[in-house]
From Swiss-Prot:
Signal peptide: none annotated. PROSITE patterns: CYT_DCMP_DEAMINASES_1 (PS00903), CYT_DCMP_DEAMINASES_2 (PS51747). Cytidine deaminase catalyzing the cytidine to uridine postranscriptional editing of a variety of mRNAs. Form complexes with cofactors that confer differential editing activity and selectivity. Responsible for the postranscriptional editing of a CAA codon for Gln to a UAA codon for stop in the apolipoprotein B mRNA. Also involved in CGA (Arg) to UGA (Stop) editing in the NF1 mRNA. May also play a role in the epigenetic regulation of gene expression by participating in DNA demethylation. GO terms for molecular function: cytidine deaminase activity; mRNA 3'-UTR AU-rich region binding; zinc ion binding. This is C->U-editing enzyme APOBEC-1. Binds 1 Zn(2+) ion per subunit. GO terms for cellular component: apolipoprotein B mRNA editing enzyme complex; cytoplasm; mRNA editing complex; nucleus. Zn(2+) binds at H61, C93, C96.
Amino acid sequence: MSSETGPVAVDPTLRRRIEPHEFEVFFDPRELRKETCLLYEINWGGRHSVWRHTSQNTSNHVEVNFLEKFTTERYFRPNTRCSITWFLSWSPCGECSRAITEFLSRHPYVTLFIYIARLYHHTDQRNRQGLRDLISSGVTIQIMTEQEYCYCWRNFVNYPPSNEAYWPRYPHLWVKLYVLELYCIILGLPPCLKILRRKQPQLTFFTITLQTCHYQRIPPHLLWATGLK
């Protein structure tokens, strides 16, 4: 719903919208912000109505907070089919992936889709294996693209009046680099993306190093998208 006065003031499906600057700093794929932000929506039983909410790290990771809270909500029905979509600023760590996998095994009627802005410590084998385990358990994991950023802006952000169509358009290259690395994780290949951060001055460097196995198993169109083929 387009609005010249910003988002609808009273949205019964959304508990809290985040501010534009929060969305920009949390979901910028170039930033290595420590905190994690979760935007999520829940659809029960194939209904058209969707329940939306936002969450950030507390003493636990946002994924664990969600799982603990989800099963205690009054609307939770363990025998009703439920579709959950997460938009995460960081991918789940290995421990969170294990908690999610265990949760899904206990609740077979739940389907989970995860869109991520960045890969969390992607060279850590525990995190890489955790993502593969999630996919093996039926979770769909994708890097956020322009479509997801635009969707989140319209549905989760307290955007300024007449700015419904605006969202922080990040360079496509960073998105493509994460897409390439996620593909390596899924295939069980060594990391090809390296991220270096200097404190003085504060700069972040993204580099790609490909081995023979990468050229052999990664589809050419993914390499072309990053200018590597």
